[in-house]
């Protein structure tokens, strides 16, 4: 399949093996895993970082197989989930960084183009999250107020 904003194909990569239960060698102590996820979140880690730490440091290849819940669901149950989904937050941070760069470098046309592409991805994601009711119906991305949104 092709990339979204390029005229080239995607890259091949490995695929996680299909499993219905956690492997025998993995750490499957449900309460300890949930406690560790909550602790990592309180330290300021994102859900992606939590997943990497759980895999690399604690030997949990899939939190969902070990606990029956995804990381975001565990965080929601403990009132630690963020209001804005992580992928949307990352794209907004990227767009903010580009806007700051363009404020100092007004003639950087390549970065202007990248900003347009990134903000179109943001709008597309917002449309999806509003339709799937993960964001309120009146939620709109505005570059002027984006920094305030991320500080919450």
From Swiss-Prot:
The lineage of its organism: Archaea, Methanobacteriati, Methanobacteriota, Stenosarchaea group, Methanomicrobia. One of its GO terms (biological process) is translation. Part of the 30S ribosomal subunit. It comes from Methanospirillum hungatei JF-1 (strain ATCC 27890 / DSM 864 / NBRC 100397 / JF-1). NCBIfam families: PRK08561.1. PROSITE patterns: RIBOSOMAL_S15 (PS00362). SUPFAM superfamilies: S15/NS1 RNA-binding domain (SSF47060). GO terms for cellular component: cytosolic small ribosomal subunit. One of its GO terms (molecular function) is structural constituent of ribosome. This is Small ribosomal subunit protein uS15. InterPro entries: Ribosomal_uS15 (IPR000589), Ribosomal_uS15_arc_euk (IPR023029), Ribosomal_uS15_N (IPR012606), uS15_NS1_RNA-bd_sf (IPR009068). Belongs to the universal ribosomal protein uS15 family. Keywords: Ribonucleoprotein, Ribosomal protein.
